[in-house]
Amino acid sequence: MNFLKSFPFFAFLYFGQYFVAVTHAATFDIVNKCTYTVWAAASPGGGRRLDSGQSWSINVNPGTVQARIWGRTNCNFDGSGRGNCETGDCNGMLECQGYGKAPNTLAEFALNQPNQDFVDISLVDGFNIPMEFSPTNGGCRNLRCTAPINEQCPAQLKTQGGCNNPCTVIKTNEYCCTNGPGSCGPTDLSRFFKERCPDAYSYPQDDPTSLFTCPSGTNYRVVFCP
């Protein structure tokens, strides 16, 4: 996936020259509070089936960038961990090795870049499950996207099990920002997402209102259907 369609990782490349002071991994507690099963996915981290009320914890090394956590819905996997999901599928694998297929609500992060973490919720790949992304030990902001987006999704963005971002459907620079920094701005369709989830990225260059920082060494909690 083009990095301009997701998280602004050019910032992380710039900071990568600095010494990484934090040496312990960050813990991410992933909790399913939905009334239905969610197949949690993490890159890096793999994947896990979470029935309602279940949780899963992963550790992510300092210095990790371009990382994300998301939920998959309506999945079927065989005993070897091969199968498919209606939303968020990652190459038909229970244990994800890459990113998921849109639409999927994303918790994105880069750790210790430098001495602070960059975090966001992104709808640049669309929306499938309500989400909260928060620190477990304080010190920074709780991010939430809990509006009934699937039910209110514009007709041209509706898809089975979720709501597509306009870039996924229309594929022009106006929505995808493929011509580089400053090449696009908010649109009526991106505003649909922003009005309902003001904390979240609604289009690829939505950085000023959507990218947040936490102190390095923070641990996190991602909740589906908070």
Swiss-Prot record:
It is found in: Vacuole. GO terms for biological process: defense response. Disulfide bonds join C34-C225, C75-C85, C90-C96, C140-C214, C145-C197, C153-C163, C167-C176, C177-C184. Keywords: Disulfide bond, Pathogenesis-related protein, Plant defense, Signal, Vacuole. It holds the Pfam family Thaumatin. It comes from the Eukaryota. GO terms for cellular component: vacuole. Its main location: other. PROSITE patterns: THAUMATIN_1, THAUMATIN_2. SUPFAM superfamilies: Osmotin, thaumatin-like protein. Residues 1-25 form the signal peptide. Belongs to the thaumatin family. PR proteins are acid-soluble, protease-resistant proteins which accumulate in the intercellular spaces of many plants as a result of the hypersensitive reaction to a pathogen. This is Pathogenesis-related protein R major form. It comes from Nicotiana tabacum.
